[in-house]
Design a protein with these regions (language model features):
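N-terminal secretory signal peptides
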Residues: 1-24, 33-42, 49
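C-terminal segment of N-terminal export signals and the immediately downstream linker at the start
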Residues: 43-58
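Peptidoglycan-targeting cell-wall enzymes and recognition modules
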Residues: 57, 65-78, 111-176, 180-185
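Sec/Tat-exported extracytoplasmic proteins
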Residues: 90-97, 107-117, 152-160, 187-191, ...
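A charged, solvent-exposed segment within the mature domains of Sec-exported extracytoplasmic proteins
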Residues: 171-211
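Active-site lining segments of carbohydrate-active enzymes
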Residues: 214
Length: 215
């Protein structure tokens, strides 16, 4: 089993490129492909009950999540909740499924679908590893799930960076991975396309069960 350190980044002068010895995402979080089931199981601990069907609380939105690893067949409760919340927020905005798919693949690649707390690439954090220094809001904003999702979509008031709906106004006509790359400007753009199937599987599992979140 790979050690946890093998998934962590080495900083670059640009703050975006990953260590040459480990194929990581733009902000150094996601190893190529998916993390093995054994690795994921060893890292996951008991998770709280699902928030689905309940109020999405402020505690949920700001929960510090430092777990690592993603396997579509072994998502833990936090990953399920976060995926459901992304779907709920996109539904609440009345957005098409293509937008939700791009949002999900970006969160899978950037943070393993966790509200990742530690700053990995200089000042990055949260579901999308957004950087305050790049106009995505404050350090607290990028670690607040609703604010981070809205900022990624380009619908929040806390971000000056162009979000998905500004950068790719005709999302449905784009290849999902390319749409994600247009927002994220990754040093490893191929990573997004690799997670399209996972995002669509998540949509198939949960979309019909999740109510729109409009708060």
């Amino acid at each position: 089993m790979s050690s946890l350190s093998s998934f962590l980044p080495a900083s670059s002068s640009a703050g975006r490129s990953a260590a040459a010895s480990a194929p990581l995402s733009r902000r150094g979080l996601f190893a190529a492909g998916t993390v093995g089931l054994a690795s994921l199981t060893s890292l996951a601990v008991a998770a709280p009950a699902s928030a689905q069907g309940e109020t999405w609380t402020e505690a949920f939105m700001t929960r510090e999540e430092t777990r690592e690893g993603f396997e579509i067949g072994a998502m833990d409760q936090w990953q399920v909740e976060n995926a459901q919340f992304i779907i709920a927020v996109c539904k609440g905005h009345g957005l098409e499924e293509a937008v939700t798919t791009v949002t999900l693949i970006t969160a899978i690649v950037e943070s393993w679908l966790y509200n990742y707390e530690p700053a990995v690439d200089l000042d990055s954090g949260g579901l999308f590893q957004q950087r305050p220094s790049m106009g995505w809001g404050s350090a607290a904003d990028v670690r607040h799930k609703k604010k981070a999702i809205d900022a990624f979509l380009g619908l929040g008031e806390i971000s000056s960076a162009p979000g998905l709906l500004q950068a790719v106004p005709d999302v449905a006509s784009w290849e999902p991975g390319q749409a994600a790359q247009t927002v994220q400007a990754s040093a490893h753009p191929e990573r997004y396309a690799e997670q399209v199937t996972s995002a669509r599987t998540i949509m198939d599992r949960y979309s019909r069960k999740v109510a729109p979140f409009t708060a």
